[in-house]
Swiss-Prot record:
GO cellular component: cytosolic large ribosomal subunit
Record-given protein name: Large ribosomal subunit protein uL1
Keywords (A to Z) from UniProt: Repressor, Ribonucleoprotein, Ribosomal protein, RNA-binding, rRNA-binding, Translation regulation, tRNA-binding
Pfam families in the cross-refs: Ribosomal_L1
Family stated for the protein in its record: Belongs to the universal ribosomal protein uL1 family.
Quaternary context: Part of the 50S ribosomal subunit.
GO molecular function terms attached to this record: rRNA binding; structural constituent of ribosome; tRNA binding
Domain of life: Bacteria
GO annotation, biological process: regulation of translation; translation
Protein's job: Binds directly to 23S rRNA. The L1 stalk is quite mobile in the ribosome, and is involved in E site tRNA release.
Species classification: Bacteria, Pseudomonadati, Campylobacterota, Epsilonproteobacteria, Campylobacterales
InterPro entries: Ribosom_uL1_bac-type, Ribosomal_uL1, Ribosomal_uL1-like, Ribosomal_uL1/biogenesis, Ribosomal_uL1_3-a/b-sand, Ribosomal_uL1_CS
Length: 232
């Protein structure tokens, strides 16, 4: 642990205790690489919303222009022609009742689950398994849809989902440290633009109260929240 603490302290010394512009932060965060693997770049936001009110529950999905840097396995619940469309789009696993049986048996070898509306009854049978793993399809994240081709392409092409917690916090991976600073910046802008677009009309005061960017194993860099609120 002493070795980890020493490394973390050395990284922390590279980060000033102030708010960084997004461009500066995206350059600085790449200098915080310390792990032997390709660390994720993560953004954390605190929003001035009260998720106890349904209209202030911020939840959705956005496709990042430069992807996430991750290989995503996609499963699709569908029937008939939609099942064929899912296969053609590149889904890794497709099915309906047979897929539900596989999930019940513990075979969950996918990262994203998509379902057509007519299959949600089947999906519901394994909801207790999918829910805790964050895999339950939802219309708000575009994973309950008849357009399975678009859904699969989005999931494979860098889509990230977001959801505010009860304290107004949310976080998401927006790339890898191996990305260029500009690619990271473009991804953050796309993510924040989606969050700003989702701002409830009932939200009062400063919408983004705090924001930070970091690597998987690095200290956080505080972002200028006022700059972020101007991103569209």
């Amino acid at each position: 642990m002493a070795k980890v603490s020493k490394r973390y302290k050395a990284l922390a010394e590279k980060v000033e205790e102030r708010k960084y512009s997004l461009a500066e932060a995206c350059t600085t965060v790449r200098d915080l690489k310390s792990a032997k693997f390709d660390e994720s770049v993560e953004i954390a936001l605190n929003l001035n919303v009260d998720p106890r009110h349904a209209d202030q529950m911020i939840r959705g999905a956005v496709v990042l222009p430069n992807g996430t840097g991750k290989t995503v396995r996609v499963a699709v619940f569908a029937k008939g022609v939609k099942l064929d469309e899912a296969k053609a789009a590149g889904a890794d696993v497709v099915g309906n009742d047979d897929l539900a049986e596989a999930i019940q048996a513990g075979n969950i070898n996918f990262d994203v689950l998509i379902a057509t509306p007519d299959c949600m009854g089947i999906v519901g049978k394994v909801g207790r398994i999918l829910g805790p793993k964050g895999l339950m399809p939802n219309p708000k994240t575009g994973t309950v849809t008849m357009d399975v081709t678009k859904a699969v392409n989005d999931a494979k092409g860098g889509q990230v989902t977001y959801r505010v917690d009860k304290k107004g916090n949310m976080q998401a991976a927006v790339g890898k440290v191996s990305f260029s600073a500009e690619a990271i910046k473009e991804n953050v802008e796309a993510f924040v633009a989606a969050i700003n677009k989702a701002k409830p009309s009932t939200a009062k005061g400063r919408y983004i109260t705090n924001a930070a960017i970091s690597l998987t194993m690095s200290p956080s860099i505080i972002l200028d929240n006022m700059e972020l609120m101007e991103i569209r």
